[in-house]
C-alpha cells in the first residue's frame, strides 16, 4: 500500500506545487489539504498562522503521510522550523527552493519578491536570498488582492489583468531582472504577470524547484515510490468543495477527482 506525500496550503495555491511534483514523480500518491475557509493567511498574525498550519499538519500526519510539503509561503515563514523539529518525517517549505531558483536566474543580482503581507513582513525571502548571496538586492511587494482573484477562479479574467497591472506598477521603475512568485497561489497568474513585466524579467515559480527538492529528499530517506500499485490521491478542503474542485481539476488535469470537506479547529 502506498504512503502519500502530504501537502498543506491556505487554499488552492499549493496545487501549483502538487502539479510540479506529479510531473517529476508520477508514481507518488498525494494527500492535499487546503484551508480555504480561513484563507487568506497573509493578513493574519504569525502565531495564528502557525496554529492553523499545525492543525493541517496533524490532520495529514494522522493519515499516515511519509513526508510533508508546506506548500504555502506564509505558513512556511511562520511554522516550518518548528514543525520540522517536532515531526519524525521529512518536512520542506517553498521559500528556500524559490530563492535558489531565483539566484540561478538573475543576471544582475536584483530580485523582486511578490508575496502576501505575512510573507513580506516576515522578511523570509530577503533572509534566504542574502544567506545564499550577500550581494543580492531584494525588492519585496505585498500583493494582497492576488489570492482572492485565484480563490474565486478569476485568474484568467480581465479582472485579473487589471489587478496585476495595478499591483505591480511599483516594480516597473526598478532594475530587477527576476521576480519570485512568493505565494503558491500566484503561479496561476503567471502568464499575466509575465506579460506585464515583459521579456527582460524572469518569473520564478518555486514549485518546480520544490518538486526537485521533494524528489531528492525522498531519495535520501529511501522513500521514493516506483511501484505500480494503485494511486489514490485525496484532496481535502475546509471550504467549498465545488469551487476547489473546479480549480483543481483544471490545474491538475484530473476531471474525475473527488474533494472531501473537513473541519479544523474549534
UniProtKB/Swiss-Prot annotation:
Substrate binds at residues 9-10, 41-42, 73-74, 184-185. GO terms for biological process: cell wall organization; peptidoglycan biosynthetic process; regulation of cell shape. GO terms for molecular function: glutamate racemase activity. PROSITE patterns: ASP_GLU_RACEMASE_1, ASP_GLU_RACEMASE_2. Its EC number is 5.1.1.3. Keywords: Cell shape, Cell wall biogenesis/degradation, Isomerase, Peptidoglycan synthesis. It catalyses: L-glutamate = D-glutamate. The active site is at 72 (proton donor/acceptor), 183 (proton donor/acceptor). Provides the (R)-glutamate required for cell wall biosynthesis. Belongs to the aspartate/glutamate racemases family. This is Glutamate racemase. It comes from Listeria innocua serovar 6a (strain ATCC BAA-680 / CLIP 11262).
Amino acid at each position: 500500500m502506498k504512503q502519500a506525500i502530504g501537502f498543506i496550503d491556505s487554499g488552492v495555491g499549493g496545487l501549483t506545487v502538487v502539479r510540479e511534483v506529479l510531473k517529476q514523480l508520477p508514481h507518488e500518491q498525494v494527500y492535499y489539504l487546503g484551508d480555504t475557509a480561513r484563507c487568506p493567511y497573509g493578513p493574519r498574525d504569525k502565531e495564528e498562522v502557525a496554529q492553523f498550519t499545525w492543525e493541517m499538519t496533524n490532520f495529514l500526519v494522522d493519515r499516515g503521510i511519509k513526508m510533508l510539503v508546506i506548500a504555502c509561503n506564509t505558513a512556511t515563514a511562520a511554522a516550518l522550523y518548528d514543525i520540522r523539529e517536532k515531526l519524525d518525517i521529512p518536512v520542506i517549505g517553498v521559500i528556500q527552493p524559490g530563492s535558489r531558483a531565483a539566484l540561478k536566474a538573475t543576471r544582475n543580482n536584483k530580485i523582486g519578491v511578490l508575496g502576501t503581507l505575512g510573507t513580506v513582513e516576515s522578511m523570509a525571502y530577503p533572509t534566504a536570498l542574502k544567506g545564499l548571496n550577500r550581494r543580492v538586492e531584494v525588492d519585496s511587494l505585498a500583493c494582497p488582492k492576488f489570492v482572492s482573484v485565484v480563490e474565486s477562479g478569476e485568474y484568467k479574467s480581465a479582472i485579473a489583468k487589471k489587478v496585476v497591472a495595478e499591483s505591480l506598477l511599483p516594480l516597473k521603475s526598478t532594475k530587477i531582472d527576476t521576480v519570485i512568485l512568493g505565494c503558491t497561489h500566484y503561479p496561476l497568474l503567471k502568464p499575466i504577470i509575465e506579460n506585464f513585466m515583459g521579456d527582460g524579467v524572469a518569473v520564478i515559480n518555486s514549485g518546480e524547484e520544490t518538486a526537485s527538492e521533494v524528489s531528492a529528499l525522498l531519495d535520501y530517506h529511501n522513500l521514493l515510490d516506483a511501484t505500480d500499485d494503485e494511486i489514490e490521491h485525496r484532496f481535502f478542503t475546509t471550504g467549498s468543495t465545488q469551487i476547489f474542485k473546479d480549480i483543481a481539476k483544471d490545474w491538475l488535469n484530473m476531471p474525475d477527482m473527488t474533494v472531501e470537506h473537513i473541519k479544523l479547529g474549534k
